[in-house]
Curated annotation (Swiss-Prot):
Residues 3-87 form the YcgL domain. This is YcgL domain-containing protein PMI1171. Coiled coil: none annotated. It comes from the Bacteria.
Amino acid sequence: MKMICAIYRSTKRDQTYLYIEKKDDFSRIPEELLQSFGEPQFAMLLDLAQRQRLANADIEKVKQALTDQGFYLQVPPPVESMLNAYLDELKNSEKTE
């Protein structure tokens, strides 16, 4: 069975995507989310039933969110702080000495 979704890029947030059930149907998207997302730019249609995985999202979470709430918001992974990485490395080196 097909599970087609439309994917849109955010104009306000880099690497942020909105997956929805039907192209150009934003009726199930909360108004606050649409305002912070910006003008959605259509990226592609995708049949989730034909895929086993997605590049930057858990496909099962995407399918479940589309079924439950009618959309899935993909945000970029957090950028690791160089300071935190350095401090963690420092702590680990102190433990081994």
